[in-house]
Swiss-Prot record:
Subcellular location: Secreted
Principal localisation: secreted
Protein's recorded name: Ovomucoid
Transmembrane region(s): none
Keyword terms: Disulfide bond, Glycoprotein, Protease inhibitor, Repeat, Secreted, Serine protease inhibitor
Disulfide cysteine pairs (residue numbers): C6-C36, C14-C33, C22-C54
Signal peptide: none
Record-linked SUPFAM superfamilies: Kazal-type serine protease inhibitors (SSF100895)
List of glycosylated residues: N43
Length: 54
């Protein structure tokens, strides 16, 4: 099972680095920062499906 540590999020701004992650909502997030901010916004209901594009 793929996991990402989002304990130091949310962050006010994310860098533009591109390292895609696929969320449990079947949406591709551009990088860990964007994904983790979305996890926080979802109150933890969003999880990582896998690394890479959906």
């Amino acid at each position: 099972v793929a996991t990402v540590d989002c304990s130091d999020y949310p962050k006010p701004a994310c860098r533009m680095e591109y390292m895609p992650l696929c969320g449990s909502d079947n949406k591709t997030y551009g990088n860990k920062c964007n994904f983790c901010n979305a996890v926080v916004d979802s109150n933890g209901t969003l999880t990582l499906s896998h690394f890479g594009k959906c």
